[in-house]
Regions:
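Conserved loop->alpha-helix
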Residues: 1-103
Length: 103
């Protein structure tokens, strides 16, 4: 399900591929990891680099052809869905740390 929204911060075409930088809602920052998974407008993708609340997506031609990503522009709002396994891991670790008095 949709967890938050993000804003397309940059869009760079390189040959037939495209790299997007997405400014993520603060509520999602703890779930963003390089090579982790996220869905953008229902499209499941692998996260590239992550820095200061911005994550990068390196989109191959086939994905651009089969989805609406190629039409996204800077400033567009996108729906973010965090991978459920990532959520489970992060929230379990947080709970265990809290139970042990580690903040």
């Amino acid at each position: 399900h949709i967890m938050a929204t993000g804003i397309i911060h940059s869009r760079v075409e390189s040959g037939d591929q495209m790299t997007f930088s997405i400014l993520a809602s603060p509520s999602t920052h703890k779930y963003l990891t390089e090579k982790g998974y996220i869905a953008i407008d229902g499209i499941s993708l692998t996260v590239g680099e992550v820095e200061n609340g911005i994550f990068h997506l390196h989109i191959i031609p086939e994905t651009l052809r089969l989805t609406t990503l190629g039409s996204k522009q800077i400033g567009d709002v996108v729906n973010l869905e965090i991978d459920s396994n990532t959520q489970l891991i992060v929230e379990t670790i947080e709970r265990l740390m809290k139970d042990r008095g580690v903040e």
